[in-house]
């Protein structure tokens, strides 16, 4: 099957800088999952995957600013069969002084098992995060344990086998999917050129232009550019 990807975007918030970067730099079909809770958006994305037949599906959070270089890098490696799951990577957050955090979203440590009586991972249960400078210094492909929904891409068959879901706490869907990828022995890859700017402010959730519970949830399909001015 020819490489025919689609970008699925979570949109619990209206973050114009992130939205505009996707519209300006990525010319593939897009689906905006607007104003859903995290459990709801997982269910809606799974439904979309089941009911369509794209070759690859890309999961994107709502708070990442994607450059053309990052988008092109991710699509280039996603098309290669040897990389089962490919993901962009991010700064963990932005510090109060406006600088990027020291650490990235890349981790090569083992994701520990979440016990049945636990509702989801605590921050101290994640393996160590690698410094941004280390990631930038790497010239080749990088193994990571976290497909952190920074344009995380895989073939349709992988998503059908491992549907998207949250932990019982209704959060941490990227950790949940990454843990199940690890259990199945499916490797996740990234590259230094796949950097996506993460707009999160510190460790707490960024309640910026929150849509959930304020507007009606909807799924919006957007095709490839016909008249680019329509999107930019």
Feature roles, as predicted:
Residues 55-65:
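Short beta-strand-to-loop acidic/aromatic patch adjacent to the donor-nucleotide binding site
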